[in-house]
Amino acid sequence: MARLQEHYQTVVKKALLEKFQYGNVMEIPRLEKIVINMGVGEASQDRKLIEGALTDMTAISGQKPIITRAKKSIAAFKLREQMIVGCKVTLRRDRMFEFLDRLVTIALPRVRDFRGVSAKSFDGRGNYNMGLKEQIVFPEIDYDRVDKVRGMDITICTSAKSDEEAKALLEGFAMPFMK
């Protein structure tokens, strides 16, 4: 069992139960999945760029990402239908908890001028979205082998009904929100 998963079972669940007074233990919010998306728009012109993104994403997440393709053609972006535009990976269970642990304890503190993540990035349904400007904050990425600095979007999906509950859940995992 992952360290953060154990922490959730022993500490976070009890704290949430006391704070929100749930009638049933199944109502307590939990993490459902984490989706990491890396947009590589330049891959539509140069096919080799997606390979670097796939390698980085595999190292960060621990599983093979799927390639995302354009749903429709957009002439302004020189984009045709089914062209490669990025890659994404969906993490669940142990890998999800291990990734969140590495994100909170290692990657976020390595971000330049980091003051905390925004508390306004909840979507109203208990999910949290954030972006990282560079993939080199993760220790799995070798700085010398990076062909291009790419950012990524991270979506943390929870079973929480409200943003307040989701924020309390993520604070239980030591997510560093801005004051």
Swiss-Prot record:
GO terms for cellular component: ribonucleoprotein complex; ribosome. The gene is rplE. NCBIfam families: PRK00010.1. It comes from Rhodospirillum rubrum (strain ATCC 11170 / ATH 1.1.1 / DSM 467 / LMG 4362 / NCIMB 8255 / S1). GO terms for biological process: translation. This is one of the proteins that bind and probably mediate the attachment of the 5S RNA into the large ribosomal subunit, where it forms part of the central protuberance. In the 70S ribosome it contacts protein S13 of the 30S subunit (bridge B1b), connecting the 2 subunits; this bridge is implicated in subunit movement. Contacts the P site tRNA; the 5S rRNA and some of its associated proteins might help stabilize positioning of ribosome-bound tRNAs. Part of the 50S ribosomal subunit; part of the 5S rRNA/L5/L18/L25 subcomplex. Contacts the 5S rRNA and the P site tRNA. Forms a bridge to the 30S subunit in the 70S ribosome. This is Large ribosomal subunit protein uL5. The lineage of its organism: Bacteria, Pseudomonadati, Pseudomonadota, Alphaproteobacteria, Rhodospirillales. The keyword rRNA-binding applies. Belongs to the universal ribosomal protein uL5 family. The keyword Nucleotidyltransferase does not apply. InterPro entries: Ribosomal_uL5, Ribosomal_uL5_bac-type, Ribosomal_uL5_C, Ribosomal_uL5_CS, Ribosomal_uL5_dom_sf, Ribosomal_uL5_N. GO terms for molecular function: rRNA binding; structural constituent of ribosome; tRNA binding. Pfam families: Ribosomal_L5, Ribosomal_L5_C. Keywords: Ribonucleoprotein, Ribosomal protein, RNA-binding, rRNA-binding, tRNA-binding.
